[in-house]
């Protein structure tokens, strides 16, 4: 309609229509209704999709006065040029580009958003033309160069806008204008652009900045011009240079990296290795450093230049020269000045880049004096930024610039100090001492430290200001603490004794304070007014000292065997000749006494004495509890103590001496195998656990840390053997089995972990009699209590009573804990034990079908058992588990089918259930990949009967499970993204791994599954659509192999061919899906060649325009030319996918017009 109107000279009517629509869209909500607004939006959408709108758009740009209409005209030109590229003459495109550029130049007062959109259209035209070399940037650069040299600020700003538009459009393969072209297309354009055109832009920018450097006293307008060019320089230097031959998937990964380092091609060598360029940016920064916005850009430019690497350097010598020159420039820029807040992050980024990007041998090759000045500067800045970061914490600033800068510098230190190849031992010791001392000082209260001190004195934070939601310091500052701990190890000679003396001093003071409070309470119990300021300061000091000690003595180890850090081991070995072992053991074993009161206390091992200092903190806490002073204690300190003890025990307690070249004698004597020290310390730690669970049951985090310590004590057989020799262990087990207070007050997650620990302990090296005793005292009571409850005649009537529900919940949590404790050597006993429960749990599903939290917990028990045990089960046992899981799903499905979810909470509950069911099915499916049950050795002696002859695979079970829950998957539930993704991942997984199972499915399930795939491709997110396309490919391949042209799957794939054809040819789709869609399309074309030809013929027959008809026919012929007839051959498929890229570039979007 629009195109026809334009062709008939009806442009004024079109303009009037668009201007009226713009008025509606721009009107306040009170003036227009929803329907009017939608109609107005439809007019613009229809206009933008109209065929060849160029003449009418030009007319609009020249005559309309409505900015929004001008903006839409520019957008319509941009989209139509790409859409109709193959139909346009090259001269028409060139004149269109010239028209747009001239239009902007002649109208300096255009609204910014209109100007930017017109320039974006120019950039898109240049980009699309760069691929077939019909347009290049040379003429544009010539014009821009003239604009820059005009000296007119308005014109220079416009020149900058033109360059920025080009840069933005070419810079990324994934974030450019959505013009329906593939990532490869954008990637190829980017590669061509970055070779020469990008450097041209940089040179133009440098010219402007040189002019800026020369000028004095700039007016505001000129300053604004230079700021824009500086931002442009930053954009160029932050360019993510694409390496050659990078596939689509890798382009996306490559471009998603956050920290882009400057790695230009060789062609940039002359430009960037010219020392005047680097000097220019240092000079510019010195000139504008007090202007916050400009300083951000100039520092970012310098940070990018500090990351220069790759083929731009011809040899190592040029790298050394560049680095030396840069460090000189940096030291000259920052020496003797007070760094502004806005400079901190930038300067730390520069230093971080220099240290991490330049190889260490280049760093050490610069003149010694220069390197020494650089490292001293790094130490000074680290301490200074650390102090400012601590101040930010006190003032609770939103923008923590110094904290970010400090973190970067600490990471830089780690890079340096961990390199013993280029720096001799002790090279950084003094610097490490400096940074470590500064950190400790910032975290201690006055007078020893500066915590909470502002420039004007004390700014102490009130206790209630600390938010409940605040992350724990040990998590929030884990990277910082890891760096400080590493620096502490480098300077162990200084740092370990320092921490010991600070901790011992605080313990003495804490003990004294608590005694004073006790006396005060005894003297006047009613007074109650105790000044806690001193205590709070002590607790905060101890908190930070324990955290630093924990990170100094042990590393974070996830999934690895924790090892004593070599620096700590060497330090202990080095001084072992000066150590008296007996005194060391006495200090370790007397946490109730002051270390200095023990004769010869100075001849103890320093590492063990540091551990002893923390045991003394723990002892003061225990004594305060016994003296009924719990209300004065800090739960945070309690958490810190057990966190440290867990971390320490994992690494040092009964360390495996085979893992070390040499071991410290004091360590092996104090807590090695078969020593009194290790037995004593295990007993001490166990006592701590039991005391904490009794006293702190309401403090969930502290109770959780405490049971984690218990798990650490029993997860290794060697430690567990010592634990089970303690009477306390058996008392704890019996108490838990009886559910007597205070253990039954613990939260459910803590009870679950406690059960896990008790089970792990139960499988230590006990004799048969002990094992039987353990079974009788720990696991049997659980079973007995459970059966007593559910076998009561009136169970149905009393099941909702609070006491009964608590008993059931506690049992279910305990079952999860038991499952979590599964290992290959206990799976036989635990599986048989748990199976009895699982069958009873299915009965509970009926009883509690209207109690969502119980249903959820029952499913979770099954999820845990499947997750932990399925991989160890032989065929018969796996069959038992499969049957139990399917019965569970049948009951769940029966209870929930057709049930009306009246409120959001009920829907949320079902969402949680189904998410767990998806996890259960995924866990069962893992049996097909992870199977340790080659022999049923682990079940010898535990087999109730022989395996049956049924062979059912996990895939069969999972498909049957999917059949049960599919009817529950309502459209509303699939709106939960995590559930939707989990569901589609599961069915795609099944289709990819077991495509042969799909045709054998019952008819209803097969239809449901096909409908799910259709729904996923047409109505879900692009991630789900991609999963469905990935599922269709193996199904089509399976169909081709089977060669059954009358099967239901054959008919379904024919329908999918039409869907994928429409998606690729007729609809706008996310270009990132082109590969998945292309692979599915190719396989479907191989399977249904006649239908594909029919689809093409039908499409061509609808084309009225002979030019479009011919172009489309040629494009389709070319598409299948490389694979005629198409076969399921990888080489042919790859050729087809390459042709498809070209096809999409030429005709993609051509048919999405009105």
From Swiss-Prot:
Its localization reads: Cytoplasm; Nucleus
Q: Principal localization?
A: cytoplasm
Q: Extract the GO molecular function terms from the UniProt entry.
A: nuclear export signal receptor activity
Task: Give GO BP annotations, semicolon-separated.
Answer: protein export from nucleus
Q: One GO CC annotation, please? A: cytoplasm
For this UniProt record, the keywords arranged alphabetically read as follows: Cytoplasm, Nucleus, Protein transport, Transport
What Pfam families is this protein classified in?
CRM1_C
Signal sequence range: none
Per the entry, what this protein does is:
Mediates the nuclear export of proteins (cargos) with broad substrate specificity.
State the similarity comment.
Belongs to the exportin family.
Protein name (record):
Exportin-4
């Amino acid at each position: 309609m629009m195109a026809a109107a334009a062709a008939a000279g009806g442009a004024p009517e079109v303009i009037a229509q668009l201007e009226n629509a713009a008025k509606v869209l721009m009107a306040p909500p009170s003036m227009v209704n929803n329907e009017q607004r939608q109609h107005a939006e439809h007019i613009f959408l229809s206009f933008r999709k109209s065929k060849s709108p160029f003449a009418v758009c030009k007319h609009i740009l020249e005559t309309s006065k409505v900015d929004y209409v001008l903006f839409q005209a520019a957008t319509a030109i941009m989209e139509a040029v790409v859409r109709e590229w193959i139909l346009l003459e090259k001269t028409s495109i060139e004149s269109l580009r010239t028209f747009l550029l001239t239009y902007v130049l002649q109208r300096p007062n255009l609204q910014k958003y209109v100007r930017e959109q017109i320039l974006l259209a120019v950039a898109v035209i240049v980009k699309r033309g760069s691929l077939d070399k019909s347009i290049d940037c040379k003429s544009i650069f010539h014009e821009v160069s003239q604009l820059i040299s005009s000296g007119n600020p308005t014109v220079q700003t416009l020149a900058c806008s033109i360059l920025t538009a080009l840069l933005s459009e070419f810079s990324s393969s994934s974030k450019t204008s959505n013009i329906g072209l593939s990532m490869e297309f954008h990637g190829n354009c980017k590669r061509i652009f970055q070779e020469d055109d990008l450097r041209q832009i940089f040179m133009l920018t440098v010219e402007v900045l040189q002019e800026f450097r020369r000028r004095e006293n700039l007016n505001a307008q000129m300053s604004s011009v230079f700021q824009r060019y500086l931002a442009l320089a930053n954009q160029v230097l932050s360019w993510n240079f694409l390496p050659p031959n990078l596939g689509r998937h890798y382009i996306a990964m490559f471009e998603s990296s956050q920290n882009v380092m400057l790695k230009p091609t060789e062609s940039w060598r002359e430009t960037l290795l010219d020392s005047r360029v680097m000097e220019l940016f240092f000079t510019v920064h010195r000139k504008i450093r007090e202007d916050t916005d400009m300083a951000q850009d100039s520092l970012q430019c310098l940070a990018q230049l500090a990351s220069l690497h790759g083929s731009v350097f011809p040899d190592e010598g040029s790298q050394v020269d560049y680095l030396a020159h840069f460090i000189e420039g940096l030291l000259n820029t920052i020496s003797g000045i007070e760094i502004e807040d806005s400079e901190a992050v930038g300067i730390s980024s520069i230093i971080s880049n220099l240290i991490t990007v330049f190889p260490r041998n280049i760093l050490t090759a610069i003149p010694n004096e220069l390197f020494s000045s650089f490292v001293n500067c790094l130490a000074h800045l680290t301490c200074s930024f650390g102090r400012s970061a601590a101040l930010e914490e006190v003032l609770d600033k939103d923008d923590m610039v110094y904290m970010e800068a400090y973190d970067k510098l600490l990471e830089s230190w780690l890079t340096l100090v961990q390199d013993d190849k280029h720096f001799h031992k002790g090279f950084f010791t003094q610097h490490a001492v400096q940074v470590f001392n500064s950190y400790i000082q910032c975290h201690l209260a006055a007078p020893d430290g500066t915590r909470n001190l502002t420039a004007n004195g004390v700014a102490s934070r009130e206790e209630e200001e600390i938010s409940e939601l605040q992350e724990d310091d040990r998590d929030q500052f884990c990277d910082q603490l890891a760096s400080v701990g590493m620096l502490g190890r480098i300077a162990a000679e200084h740092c370990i004794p320092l921490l010991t003396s600070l901790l011992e001093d605080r313990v003495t003071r804490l003990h004294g304070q608590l005694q004073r409070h006790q006396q005060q309470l005894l003297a006047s119990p009613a007074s109650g007014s105790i000044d806690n300021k001193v205590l709070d300061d002590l607790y905060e000091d101890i908190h930070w000292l324990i955290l630093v000690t924990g990170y100094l003595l042990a590393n974070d180890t996830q999934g690895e065997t924790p090892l004593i850090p070599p620096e700590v081991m060497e330090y202990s070995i080095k001084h072992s000749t000066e150590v008296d072992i007996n005194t060391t053991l006495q200090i370790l074993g007397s946490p109730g006494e002051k270390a200095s009161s023990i004769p010869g206390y100075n001849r103890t091992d320093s590492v063990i004495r540091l551990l002893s200092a923390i045991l003394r903190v723990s002892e003061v806490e225990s004594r305060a509890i016994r003296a009924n002073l719990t209300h004065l204690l800090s739960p945070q300190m309690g958490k810190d103590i057990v966190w440290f003890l867990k971390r320490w025990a994992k690494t040092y307690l009964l360390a495996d001496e085979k893992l070390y070249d040499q071991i410290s004698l004091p360590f092996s004597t104090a807590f090695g195998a078969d020593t009194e020290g290790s037995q004593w310390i295990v007993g001490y730690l166990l006592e701590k656990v039991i005391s904490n669970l009794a006293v702190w049951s309401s403090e969930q985090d502290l109770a959780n840390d405490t049971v984690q310590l218990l798990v650490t004590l029993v997860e290794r057989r060697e430690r567990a053997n010592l634990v089970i020799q303690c009477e306390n262990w058996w008392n704890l087990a019996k108490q838990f089995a009886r559910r007597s207070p205070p253990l039954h007050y613990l939260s459910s997650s803590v009870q679950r972990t406690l059960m896990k620990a008790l089970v792990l302990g139960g499988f230590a090296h006990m004799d048969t009699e002990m094992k039987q005793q353990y079974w009788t005292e720990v696991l049997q009571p659980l079973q007995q209590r459970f059966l007593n409850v559910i076998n009561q005649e009136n169970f149905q009537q009393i099941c909702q009573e609070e006491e009964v529900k608590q008993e059931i919940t506690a049992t279910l949590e305990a079952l999860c804990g038991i499952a979590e404790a599964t290992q290959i050597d206990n799976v036989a006993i635990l599986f048989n034990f748990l199976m009895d429960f699982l069958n009873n749990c299915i009965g509970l599903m009926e009883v509690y079908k209207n109690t969502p939290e119980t249903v959820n917990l029952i499913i979770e028990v099954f999820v845990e058992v499947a997750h932990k045990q399925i991989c160890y089960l032989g065929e018969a046992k796996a069959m038992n588990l499969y049957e139990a899981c399917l019965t569970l799903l049948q009951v769940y499905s029966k209870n929930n089918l057709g049930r009306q979810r009246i409120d959001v909470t009920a829907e949320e509950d079902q969402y949680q259930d189904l998410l767990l069911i998806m996890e259960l099915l995924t866990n069962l499916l893992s049996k097909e990949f992870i199977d340790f049950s080659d022999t049923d050795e682990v079940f010898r002696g535990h087999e109730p009967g022989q395996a049956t002859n049924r062979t059912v695979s996990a895939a069969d079970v999972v498909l049957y499970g999917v059949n049960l829950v599919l009817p529950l998957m309502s459209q509303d539930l699939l709106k939960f993204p995590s559930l939707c993704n989990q569901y589609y991942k599961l069915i795609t997984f099944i289709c990819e791994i077991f495509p042969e199972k799909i045709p054998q499915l019952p008819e209803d399930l097969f239809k449901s599954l096909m409908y799910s795939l259709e729904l996923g491709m047409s109505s879900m997110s692009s991630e789900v659509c991609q999963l469905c396309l990935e599922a269709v490919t193996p199904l089509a391949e399976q169909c081709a192999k089977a060669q059954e042209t009358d099967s239901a799957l054959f008919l379904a794939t024919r329908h999918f061919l039409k869907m994928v054809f429409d998606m690729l040819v007729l609809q706008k789709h996310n270009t990132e899906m082109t590969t998945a869609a292309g692979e599915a399309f190719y396989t479907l074309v191989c399977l249904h060649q006649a239908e594909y030809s029919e689809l093409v013929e039908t499409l061509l027959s609808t084309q009225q325009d002979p030019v479009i008809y011919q172009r489309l026919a040629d494009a389709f012929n070319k598409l299948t030319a490389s694979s005629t007839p198409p076969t399921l051959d990888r080489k042919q498929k790859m050729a087809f996918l390459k042709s498809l890229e070209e096809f999409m570039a030429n005709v993609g979007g051509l048919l999405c017009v009105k």
